[in-house]
């Protein structure tokens, strides 16, 4: 099964350990789900899940699904943003950053969004998450997945790492680089990756990873931390990459990769994979196929200096207040347009398959850009007034939050400075005025459904749950007339409008079950 180049290299590096470390515990690749703390606890999820689970060793919020034919994208809890479908070892990297509420966090290579959803859960709606993806189509998938997960404080970018570093130098408290890689950890999961694999691809991805790491270093604030990860085994992209980075950046130190968590997993790094450069491989981590995952490498790097003081819970720093004021001023000049529609997320398999392709495209400089559409048919003042009236009725806790007009639609903005970066979303697009009435957006319900005063409460066993997710009208049992949030077991699925005992379906067409 292994590619000829891959097997020859690994046998030379590992010797007699090769067959043991690459022995898979089962013929089919393991499936995993990671639970979002924005919705519930791992214990709360396990108590309600209707499919067999066992705890993952790689992340306290993750589980291995013990049902080979499980289709996560069709499960109502997936639609409600309760879990993200992730290969088990892929959930290991994000917790290593030690993210806390109030931090500014950058996920530099974020699509399709699994690790960003973990970082958002750690922030608990406070601070800032900037999730970037260079390939335009994947950036749209990223945006859609963060909407589904109910993330309210994210900025989604479609940019190059170098431009982000130039626009936001020394800005972030934490940076995650889950680098585009040669994807050797996908061989069992995606046999097609074998056909794409070669030594030239490894070298190209290593060069790209070095450039991305240099940009990440420039964007990291003094005292900040950076976690670098890949899903490959190639020395040039793993231990060798980190060792070379430390040679270029003496201001960084290699820290124990497990220093921010209270559990252990995997194995130490390999001393013969550093390219002859010094590296304390006991501080980095590898996950081998024999350990229950497809394969991952992780290292934690700490920048010199003193970390900034984080704001008090629920408060903005003075500069963040200025950014919000600037966004409001820019919104006064907004123009009308059509409402933005939700993107259809690709399934996790397609997103994983694109990892190596994204690396090749980035190396070759290929990427298309798509611009965010504006929304609404009212003036900025009319849009804001309509939103305030709507919020007072249905989301009173949101009525006094800072709101701005973007292209005629109303946005609850993330605190983010004005730049020339290509922003796909900066906060929560709550809706727009259409035909003289405020019409809420799907993201409003996924991000703030728990605050809605009018809810249609469904359960996993309720036949109306699948009917709603399929786009059909359902009977109203608990919601009064008007707009409502449709929930499953208390978790928000989306919006609807009640009239005459029926809930008119407003679940986005692109997301519906077929």
Task: Please identify what each model-predicted range represents.
Residues 1-48, 304-514:
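Polybasic, low-complexity RNA-engagement segments
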Residues 54, 58-99, 142, 493, ...:
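Class I SAM-dependent transferase core
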Residues 102-111:
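Conserved class I S-adenosyl-L-methionine
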Residues 112-125:
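Conserved SAM-binding loop of SAM-dependent methyltransferases across substrates and taxa
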Residues 123-124, 220-222:
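Helix-to-beta-strand junctions that scaffold the AdoMet/dcAdoMet cofactor pocket
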Residues 126-130:
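Short beta-strand element of Class I
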Residues 132-170, 177:
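S-adenosyl-L-methionine
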Residues 137, 174-214, 227, 231-239, ...:
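Mobile active-site "lid"/loop adjacent to the S-adenosyl-L-methionine
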């Amino acid at each position: 099964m292994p590619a000829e180049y891959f097997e020859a290299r690994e046998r030379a590096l590992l010797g007699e350990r090769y067959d043991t470390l690459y022995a898979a515990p089962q013929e089919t690749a393991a499936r995993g789900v990671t639970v979002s703390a924005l919705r519930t606890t791992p214990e709360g999820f396990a108590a309600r899940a209707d499919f067999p689970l066992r705890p993952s060793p790689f992340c306290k919020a993750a589980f291995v699904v013990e049902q080979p034919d499980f289709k996560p994208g069709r499960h109502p809890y997936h639609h409600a943003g309760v879990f993200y479908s992730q290969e088990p070892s892929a959930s290991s990297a994000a917790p290593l950053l030690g993210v806390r509420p109030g931090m500014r966090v950058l996920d530099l290579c974020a699509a399709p969004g699994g690790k960003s959803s973990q970082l958002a859960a750690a922030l608990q709606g406070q601070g800032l998450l900037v999730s970037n993806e260079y390939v335009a189509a994947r950036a749209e998938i990223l945006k859609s997945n963060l909407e589904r997960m109910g993330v309210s404080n994210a900025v989604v970018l479609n940019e190059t790492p170098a431009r982000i570093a130039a626009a936001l130098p020394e800005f972030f408290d934490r940076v995650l680089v889950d680098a585009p890689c040669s994807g050797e950890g996908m061989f069992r999961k995606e046999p097609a990756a074998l056909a794409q694999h070669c030594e030239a691809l490894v070298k190209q991805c290593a060069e790209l990873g070095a450039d991305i790491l240099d940009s990440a270093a420039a964007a990291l604030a003094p005292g900040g931390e950076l976690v670098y990860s890949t899903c490959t085994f190639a020395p040039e992209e793993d231990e060798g990459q980190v060792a070379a980075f430390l040679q270029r950046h003496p201001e960084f130190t290699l820290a124990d990769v497990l220093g921010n968590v209270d559990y252990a997993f995997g194995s130490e790094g390999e001393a013969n994979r550093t390219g002859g450069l010094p590296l304390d491989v006991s501080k980095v981590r590898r996950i081998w196929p024999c350990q229950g995952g497809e394969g991952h490498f992780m290292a934690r790097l700490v920048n010199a200096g003193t970390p900034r003081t984080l704001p008090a819970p629920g408060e903005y720093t003075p500069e963040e207040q200025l950014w919000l004021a600037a966004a409001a001023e820019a919104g006064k000049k907004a123009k009308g347009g059509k409402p933005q529609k939700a993107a259809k997320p690709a399934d996790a398999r397609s997103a994983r398959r694109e990892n190596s392709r994204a690396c090749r495209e980035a190396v070759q400089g290929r990427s298309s850009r798509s611009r965010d559409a504006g929304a609404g048919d009212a003036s900025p003042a009319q849009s804001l007034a309509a939103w305030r009236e709507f919020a007072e009725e249905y989301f009173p806790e949101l009525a006094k939050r800072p709101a701005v007009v973007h292209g005629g639609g109303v946005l609850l903005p993330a605190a983010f400075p004005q730049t020339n970066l290509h922003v796909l979303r900066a906060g929560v697009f709550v809706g727009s005025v259409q035909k003289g009435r405020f019409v809420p957006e799907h993201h409003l319900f996924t991000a703030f459904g728990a605050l809605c005063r009018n809810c249609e409460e469904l359960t996993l066993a309720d036949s109306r749950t699948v009917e709603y997710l399929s786009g059909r009208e359902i009977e109203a049992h608990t919601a009064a007339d008007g707009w409502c949030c449709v929930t499953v077991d208390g978790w928000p699925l989306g919006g609807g409008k009640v009239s005459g005992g029926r809930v008119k379906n407003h679940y986005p067409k692109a997301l519906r079950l077929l």
